[in-house]
């Protein structure tokens, strides 16, 4: 699986549609390839123009194939495209590479957008779960719950083929590319490559092809067991056996500390995990609550028996103070308190936060506020990233997003989910979607092909070919 550069998928749309009052105007065509020196010049120009901050940790790109509704290879990219809008909202890494602070995935219910995020979650959990196998910590158990890696079910061939993952990420030390191929929990292929940021030197660290394992470069002197389980990732084994190795630690710290997923489906547990004793987290939460113009001025947490907690909010209305139990608050406020600690921690630490159906948790006005907070480099000083799925179209506009921050997922008539970015769309004249276009309006009109009632006007036979 190769995903070194930004990928562009080609989708063919039927222009003259029967029983439809409008025509599809856009299709996805390959962009012009940006040469390395051209891209570097663009990145340096942006950095000089806006003086963007430098960060060290980043999710760069994720690719998956044959996972649940995803049959064919799809790539989700957090690398900024060379486009002109909102150039002050880009995260700049130490070697002038530019990354996105926010990405939203849109699409109909059942279209597969959650599966894109679940695929990433499944990969991270597959690596980390063995490291915490003996832990009795309830929070860790909740985070490390087993996620079943299932192949695409609507094709006889793919049902018997492995699922393929590829993850491209950065730490303060290096850029890593990790590949994992899994079939019925068994590891068929695994590889880890590294580029040291200080020298730019690229090297392979290990390669595993079924039972054959080769350790290279910084791992050349490490040893593996002849009885290594075929369901245990080699990366996990190295983390257990060589936890003090600098490179092993650097890689696994990213998996463990630099990316979080929020979709546990258990509100009480979620709240207990969210509420933090950190004064920095509380201070930032209160700042955000005030900026949202809510009348909560403070809150406190009481720990109860059986690992229960109660949260009390302090309100001031017309100079009158009152304290309420969080469970007496509106559902929106309760959802906000389950969410804001994760947001605050991500902003303070500069981590990647992945949330399924973020819009279901909060009001559209607050959703816009959170998106703009991550996009504001004065507030997002550590280079945190927010990735989420959404149905909310009120934020799908050029004020809130760059075109490369908007993604769509849609299913074809073979139930195969396709993932594509708004920046990839081109019309027949080779023109991109305008940066000042009304994205939400064009989406509803079917010009981006990710709405269920538009399936009949998309030539999915050609797409799925």
Q: Would you name each region that the model predicts?
A:
Residues 102-106, 308-344, 348, 352-365:
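Conserved ABC ATPase signature
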Residues 175-301:
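Electropositive, glycine-dotted interaction segments
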Residues 98-147, 336-337, 342, 373:
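Phosphate-binding glycine-rich loops of NTP-binding sites
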Residues 55-57, 65, 263-328, 448, ...:
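Extended helical coiled-coil dimerization/tether regions that scaffold
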Residues 158-175:
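Conserved amphipathic alpha-helical "coupling/scaffold" segments
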Residues 50-61, 372-465:
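C-terminal lobe/lid and adjacent interdomain/linker elements of RecA-like ASCE P-loop ATPase modules
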């Amino acid at each position: 699986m190769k995903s070194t550069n930004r990928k562009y998928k080609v989708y063919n749309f039927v222009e003259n549609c029967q029983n439809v009052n409008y025509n599809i105007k856009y299709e996805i065509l390959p962009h012009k390839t940006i040469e390395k020196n051209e891209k570097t010049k663009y990145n340096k120009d942006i950095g000089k123009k806006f003086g963007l901050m430098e960060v060290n940790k980043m999710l760069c790109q994720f690719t998956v194939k044959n996972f649940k509704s995803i049959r064919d290879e799809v790539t989700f990219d957090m690398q900024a495209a060379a486009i002109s809008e909102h150039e002050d909202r880009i995260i700049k890494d130490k070697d002038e590479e530019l990354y996105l602070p926010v990405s939203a995935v849109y699409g109909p219910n059942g279209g597969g957008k959650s599966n894109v995020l679940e695929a990433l979650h499944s990969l991270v959990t597959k690596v980390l779960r063995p490291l915490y196998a003996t832990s009795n910590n309830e929070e860790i158990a909740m985070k490390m719950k087993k996620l079943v890696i299932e192949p695409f079910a609507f094709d006889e061939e793919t049902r018997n083929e492995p699922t393929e993952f590829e993850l491209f990420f950065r730490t303060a030390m290096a850029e890593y590319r990790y590949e994992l191929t899994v079939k019925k929990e068994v590891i068929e292929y695994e590889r880890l490559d590294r580029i040291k940021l200080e020298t730019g030197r690229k090297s392979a660290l290990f390669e595993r092809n079924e039972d054959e394992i080769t350790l290279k470069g910084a791992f050349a002197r490490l040893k593996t067991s002849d009885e290594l389980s075929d369901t245990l990732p080699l990366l996990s084994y190295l983390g257990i056996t060589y936890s003090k190795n600098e490179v092993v630690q650097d890689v696994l710290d990213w998996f463990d500390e630099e990316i979080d997923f929020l979709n546990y489906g258990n509100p009480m547990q979620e709240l207990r995990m969210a509420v933090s004793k950190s004064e920095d987290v509380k201070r930032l939460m209160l700042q955000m609550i005030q900026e949202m113009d809510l009348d909560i001025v403070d809150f406190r947490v009481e720990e109860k028996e059986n690992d229960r907690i109660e949260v009390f909010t302090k309100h001031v209305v017309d100079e009158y103070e009152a304290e309420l139990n969080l469970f007496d608050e509106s559902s929106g406020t309760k959802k906000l308190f389950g969410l804001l600690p994760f947001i605050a921690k991500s902003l303070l630490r500069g981590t990647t936060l992945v949330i399924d159906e973020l819009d279901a948790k909060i009001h559209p006005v607050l959703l816009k506020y959170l998106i703009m907070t991550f996009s504001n480099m004065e507030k997002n000083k550590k280079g945190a990233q927010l990735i989420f799925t959404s149905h909310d179209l009120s934020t799908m506009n050029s004020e809130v997003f760059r075109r490369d921050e908007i993604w769509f997922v849609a299913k074809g008539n073979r139930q195969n989910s396709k993932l594509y970015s708004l920046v990839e769309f081109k019309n027949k004249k080779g023109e991109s979607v305008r940066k000042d276009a009304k994205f939400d309006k064009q989406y509803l009109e079917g010009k981006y092909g990710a709405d269920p009632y538009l399936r009949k006007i998309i030539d999915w036979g050609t797409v799925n070919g």
